């Protein structure tokens, strides 16, 4: 029994360090090879620690094949790969044709270049074969643009210069995005250029800064990728978003790497990377410092991998919020491996609303260093914004199950190191802390009995 338990946990360690890393100067496409089949041979009846009320991670792993669920299955894109020298596209067919936004009238001199970008996109998207649309090394001012597909071409958007948002809030009206790529398959967006949302005018008028009417005006997201499958976004600077910097929504097979995402610490709601209803996504080798979550993962997202992430300032790496207004939300297969968080308000957070339903399951946080983080490890199944919601009568909750924290180090800035605030009606299950050492803080656990492995400090 002890041997099988030891082998299982050895497998977990092998699994979580076996992911390939992304080189910011090389290919983004690397097939992940994990020894996921081993778990099929483990008998959960001999898995060691057991609690009827709070099943352990090793109890619940069998049958669910949790590591297989977590494993991102990012596929090699058909007949395409990143050129390791130029960062461009190499195909087995004829060389890609290159066009520039300047060919369609863009000036890059402070004038409105929106129509030139629209015309250039239509030309590139409607062409056959491989196309590279270049944004030269100038500053281009553009209004909201929808880059729509499907495209006939295998399309690369190569940004050398800076794309800047207009500061005129009136042009957005009811538009909740600035740049949106919709239904574009096999798209590659690469730098080394910059996307600048010029968000200061929006921040000054947000409800958090100016609560008086008309503060309810919804600020747009800087860059949205919607229904984009087999997507690569690499080597870009994205800064000062009006609200969220980058959203991946309704996408399958995404590689986002070597991104620098920045905004002032006091800029409201400026999440770095937001993942919603997206499957098989890898975020790697990126530096994120904003006024909200560095990475937020919400409902419908599965097999999400984040590796080599530097986070701060901001609100940390967050799963949720889930279950707002009684909704049913699901997130599964999240793997965070190799993160450094400094001065953030939260570190590794799972947040669900009282009264919601659904699940957040099969989650691994591995190899994380946190320095002066206010809430380094936090699960909150009882979240409620009492200013706008009445949650007193709510009994249901989003299930939080099968969560592993492994090799976590750092310091708390608040006196709180580990907070597991689980629901009384739907308590957390399968919470495991292994080799966790957080200084300057205490641990508090409600409605959960975590399993400890190795040196864990503090403990509940």
UniProtKB/Swiss-Prot annotation:
The catalytic activity of this protein is classed by the Enzyme Commission as 3.2.1.15
Any GO BP: fruit ripening
Point out the coiled-coil segments of this chain.
Answer: none
| Keywords assigned | Cell wall, Cell wall biogenesis/degradation, Fruit ripening, Glycoprotein, Glycosidase, Hydrolase, Secreted, Signal
GO molecular-function terms, A-Z: polygalacturonase activity
The main place the protein resides is secreted
Residues bearing carbohydrate: 280, 421
Annotated function: Acts in concert with the pectinesterase, in the ripening process. Is involved in cell wall metabolism, specifically in polyuronide degradation.
User: Which family would the database say this protein is a member of?
Assistant: Belongs to the glycosyl hydrolase 28 family.
Q: What is this protein called?
A: Polygalacturonase
């Amino acid at each position: 029994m002890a041997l099988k338990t030891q082998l299982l946990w050895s497998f977990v360690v092998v699994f979580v360090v076996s992911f390939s890393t992304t080189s910011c100067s090389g290919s983004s496409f690397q097939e992940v090879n994990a020894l996921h089949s081993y778990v099929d041979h483990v008998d959960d009846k001999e898995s060691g620690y057991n609690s009827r009320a709070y099943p352990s991670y090793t109890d619940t792993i069998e049958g669910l094949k949790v590591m297989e669920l977590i494993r991102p299955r990012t596929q090699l894109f058909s007949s395409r790969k990143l050129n390791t020298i130029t960062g461009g596209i190499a195909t087995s067919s004829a060389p890609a044709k290159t066009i520039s936004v300047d060919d369609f009238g863009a000036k890059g001199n402070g004038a409105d270049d929106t129509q030139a970008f629209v015309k250039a996109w239509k030309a590139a998207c409607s062409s056959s074969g491989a196309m590279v649309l270049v944004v030269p090394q100038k500053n281009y001012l553009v209004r909201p643009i929808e880059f729509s597909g499907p495209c006939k071409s295998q399309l690369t958007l190569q940004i050398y210069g800076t794309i800047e948002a207009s500061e005129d809030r009136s042009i957005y009206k009811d538009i909740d995005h600035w740049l949106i790529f919709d239904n574009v398959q096999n798209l590659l967006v690469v730098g080394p250029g910059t996307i600048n949302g010029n968000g200061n005018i929006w921040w000054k008028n947000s409800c958090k800064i100016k609560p008086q009417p008309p503060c309810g005006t919804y600020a747009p997201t800087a860059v949205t990728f919607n229904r984009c499958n087999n997507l690569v976004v690499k080597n870009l600077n994205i800064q000062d978003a009006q609200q969220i910097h980058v959203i991946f929504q309704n996408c399958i097979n995404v590689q986002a790497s070597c991104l620098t995402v920045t905004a002032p610490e006091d800029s409201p709601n400026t999440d770095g990377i937001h993942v919603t209803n997206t499957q098989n996504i890898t975020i790697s080798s990126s530096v994120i410092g904003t006024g909200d979550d560095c990475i937020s993962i919400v409902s419908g997202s599965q097999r999400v991998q984040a590796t080599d992430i530097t986070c701060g300032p901001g609100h940390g790496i967050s799963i949720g919020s889930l279950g707002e207004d009684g909704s049913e939300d699901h997130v599964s297969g999240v793997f965070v491996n190799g993160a450094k968080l400094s001065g953030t308000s939260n570190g590794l957070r799972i947040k669900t609303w009282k009264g919601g339903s659904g699940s957040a399951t099969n989650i691994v946080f591995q190899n994380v260093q946190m320095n002066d983080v206010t809430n380094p490890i936090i699960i909150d199944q009882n979240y409620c914004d009492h200013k706008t919601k009445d949650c007193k009568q709510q009994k249901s909750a989003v299930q939080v199950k099968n969560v592993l924290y492994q090799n976590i180090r750092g310091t708390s800035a608040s006196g709180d190191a580990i907070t597991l605030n689980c629901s009384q009606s739907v308590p957390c299950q399968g919470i495991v802390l292994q080799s966790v050492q957080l200084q300057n803080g205490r641990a508090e656990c409600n409605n959960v009995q975590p399993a400890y492995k190795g040196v864990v400090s503090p403990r509940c």
